[in-house]
Amino acid sequence: MSLRSLFVAGLATLALAVPAPQIQARQGMSSNELESGPCRDVTFIFARGSTEQGNMGLIVGPGVCSSLKKDLGSDKVACQGVGGAYTAQLAPNFLSQNTNQASINAATDMFDLANTKCPNTKIVAGGYSQGSAVIDNTIQALGSDLKAKVKGVVLFGFTRNVADKGQIPGYPKDQTKIYCAVGDMVCVNTLIITPAHLTYGADAGDAAKFLASKVQE
């Protein structure tokens, strides 16, 4: 069986293991507070994992958003998912950047919007699974001025963990926190999906506290 077949089969198997209410909840997890709302002190940009619906997904993105609002104040944080050309399809995982350029461009648009619409906002970001590669590649390519406005990044099930040596190249390591669960094969340079890859919701609160600490420095 090919690696791609294992990846697809793994996702299918895990989907069957997800309780029905959770599957139903996946249908509408979106947040567009940067695009549609007022400027806030902090802007959280998140890229979901492959096959997740909405622009925030379900596994971890919404949890980090809600925890960050709890820690800093709901009126202080704008949460924005990466949508548009980032459709979270499976195939881009097999490309050299573990995602495609269109997805990276979609995320870049959100960072650019935060910078131009809300020049005083502090930007934090996160990504899960393929979304971790989207955010990783996006931040690497940001101009120095905009990159300096990104105060913290959290990555879950980091598909480029080995390739990028546990960090985002060209971005401060102390402003990055990577979550790789024991048994998550995605973090060790494979695309084999195991149950551990679905556990990152448990890390949402810790990730939010990390991001909150960075915007308060």
UniProtKB/Swiss-Prot annotation:
Alphabetically ordered keywords of this record: Disulfide bond, Hydrolase, Secreted, Serine esterase, Signal
GO molecular function list: carboxylesterase activity; cutinase activity; lipase activity
Active-site residues, as the UniProt record annotates them: 129, 184, 197
Disulfide linkage: 39-118, 65-79, 180-187
Domain of life: Eukaryota
EC number: 3.1.1.74
Pfam families referenced in this protein's UniProt entry, alphabetically: Cutinase (PF01083)
Compartments, record wording: Secreted
Presence of the UniProt keyword Amino-acid biosynthesis in the record: no
Record family assignment: Belongs to the cutinase family.
Name recorded for this polypeptide: Probable cutinase 3
Species of origin: Aspergillus fumigatus (strain ATCC MYA-4609 / CBS 101355 / FGSC A1100 / Af293) (Neosartorya fumigata)
